[in-house]
């Protein structure tokens, strides 16, 4: 059946991809070489809530009644809240830009610092644990946000199980997180806060960085592409798809671009595994 109507519950995984803050790849995920940059998986995700704010309704009132109503976009911030069953010093340090230090056999992380407000921007992939279409067949629902800033909240010590919360600010971008440029001709919009992806296999995203030499770019060994036809590679700067060949039609692991990527060429691959 067509990928359209579905329902589901729970979270399978949340993956964060820190973004380049300067240079030609500013706003792209921080890949480093021809090996797949997989981002950082958030441990123990429990729930995620999006909030795009309520639309404004403005009535035309005269003679004691409403004659017409105009609905306009919300002026509230687009945000989210991620809750997890684990806390991670490494993840908190990554997001806030502070350092973990070792003192004796202990690790120490500063919190509530003078760097508040300087948290890094990430792309974010959020995947549902179980989704079925309207015929009961298994499928996958994934949200991909190109601009997300996560602020870790301190955990409380009570008789309840630990709950770690991250408050998230979401921003619009002119391209999807994998680099595809949004255009009126193709998407009928030029900016978006997130992409909602429906797929038969598990959707994934990885990044590669060219160096004028590397010609083979690899996927994670534990996450090969189900089929090469499910994989698309994008150049982040041009916003266009990259031509090339895969080493196999099923369980593909290696992509060879038609043209060897230049130094600092940021390639992003989206595929199903």
Question: Each predicted region: which residue ranges?
Answer:
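Surface-exposed ligand/attachment interfaces on beta-rich extracellular proteins
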Residues: 60-68, 107-112, 157-158, 208-224, ...
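Extracellular-facing segments of soluble proteins and assemblies that are Gly/Ser/Thr-biased and enriched
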Residues: 70-135
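Extended beta-strand solenoid/passenger and fiber regions
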Residues: 189-248, 254-255, 260-273
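Mixed-charge, glycine-accented linear interaction segment located at domain edges/termini
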Residues: 144-205, 272-273
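Exposed beta-sheet edge/beta-hairpin loop segments within beta-rich domains
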Residues: 71-74, 111-116, 153-163, 259-260
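Short N-terminal edge-element motif at the start of the domain
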Residues: 29-63, 94-116
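Polar/acidic, low-complexity leader/linker segments enriched in S/T/G and N/D
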Residues: 1-50
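Oligomerization/assembly interface segments of phage tail-like spikes and tubes
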Residues: 58-93, 97, 159-175
